Curated annotation (Swiss-Prot):
Organism, as annotated: Sarcophaga bullata (Grey flesh fly)
GO molecular function per UniProt: glucose-6-phosphate dehydrogenase activity; NADP binding
Gene of this entry: ZW
Functional note: Cytosolic glucose-6-phosphate dehydrogenase that catalyzes the first and rate-limiting step of the oxidative branch within the pentose phosphate pathway/shunt, an alternative route to glycolysis for the dissimilation of carbohydrates and a major source of reducing power and metabolic intermediates for fatty acid and nucleic acid biosynthetic processes.
Name recorded for this polypeptide: Glucose-6-phosphate 1-dehydrogenase
Enzyme class per UniProt: oxidoreductase
Length: 153
């Protein structure tokens, strides 16, 4: 994301909000990422701007409270404007169903479009892949769903 932001390849204004079970802060994430970012001295100001656009919410994958906190954070970030939301799910397949249900119930943008990107193995086999596809189809329109499967092909 840093490289996309650095190179002006993201629409303006783009903001980022991470969500996971880990009890972290944005500062913790920044510190863990530093060695991978390859920031040049002349990019330092832009790098600081990038981190000002980042937020993080910690919560469970199956309860409502964390997703309600995520929704509140995204609303604060949007500042009452129209916002499109991209939910990028790099999760174990075992939690896809609960997470996507909570996103649908609680976290969708009411004023912009929504997209859900599913990364990782898309199921364990043909049967579980179809089950996941059917589940997603019950929640989202096909044009809202993007699948990235490292094992396809």
């Amino acid at each position: 994301l840093w490289w996309l932001y650095r190179d002006n390849l993201l629409p303006k204004p783009t903001k980022f909000c991470g969500y996971a079970r880990s009890k972290l802060t944005t500062a913790d994430i920044r510190k863990a990422c530093e060695k991978f970012m390859k920031v040049q001295p002349h990019e330092q100001q832009r790098y600081e701007e990038f981190w000002e656009l980042n937020h993080y919410v910690s919560g469970s994958y199956d309860g409502r409270l964390g997703f309600e906190m995520l929704q509140q954070q995204m609303e604060i970030m949007e500042n009452k404007g129209v916002a499109n939301r991209v939910f990028y799910l790099a999760l174990p397949p075992s939690v896809f169903n609960s997470v996507t249900v909570r996103i649908k119930e609680i976290c969708l943008s009411k004023k912009g479009w929504n997209r859900v990107i599913i990364e990782k193995p898309f199921g364990r086999d043909d049967v579980t892949s179809k089950q996941l596809s059917d589940h997603l189809a019950s929640l989202f329109d096909e044009e809202q769903i993007y699948r990235i499967d490292h094992y396809l092909g």
